[in-house]
């Protein structure tokens, strides 16, 4: 395990990284929000189906 090599790798990545533009940030936020919404909706649908089935929740 070469700590100096690892630190140099991290510094190189940070130098290449840049702050996203407002348009990129907005698009990523919308996609992440839609994903969170869909996962929540799927969970709600599963809960609703399980509560209507006999022996469910």
Curated annotation (Swiss-Prot):
The chain crosses the membrane at residues 33-53. Signal peptide: none annotated. One of its GO terms (biological process) is protein secretion. It is found in: Cell membrane. One of its GO terms (molecular function) is protein transmembrane transporter activity. SUPFAM superfamilies: Preprotein translocase SecE subunit. Keywords: Cell membrane, Membrane, Protein transport, Translocation, Transmembrane, Transmembrane helix, Transport. It comes from the Archaea. It is a single-pass membrane protein. The keyword Transport applies. InterPro entries: Prot_translocase_SecE_dom_sf (IPR023391), Translocase_Sec61-g (IPR008158), Translocase_SecE/Sec61-g (IPR001901). Belongs to the SecE/SEC61-gamma family. Essential subunit of the Sec protein translocation channel SecYEG. Clamps together the 2 halves of SecY. May contact the channel plug during translocation. NCBIfam families: PRK09400.1-6 (NF006910), secE_euk_arch (TIGR00327). Component of the Sec protein translocase complex. Heterotrimer consisting of SecY (alpha), SecG (beta) and SecE (gamma) subunits. The heterotrimers can form oligomers, although 1 heterotrimer is thought to be able to translocate proteins. Interacts with the ribosome. May interact with SecDF, and other proteins may be involved. This is Protein translocase subunit SecE. It comes from Haloferax mediterranei (strain ATCC 33500 / DSM 1411 / JCM 8866 / NBRC 14739 / NCIMB 2177 / R-4). The gene is secE.
């Amino acid at each position: 395990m070469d700590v100096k090599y690892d630190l140099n790798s991290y510094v190189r990545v940070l130098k290449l990284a840049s702050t996203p533009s407002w348009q990129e940030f907005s698009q990523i936020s919308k996609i992440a929000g839609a994903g969170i919404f869909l996962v929540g909706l799927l969970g709600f649908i599963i809960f609703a189906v399980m509560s209507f089935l006999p022996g469910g929740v």
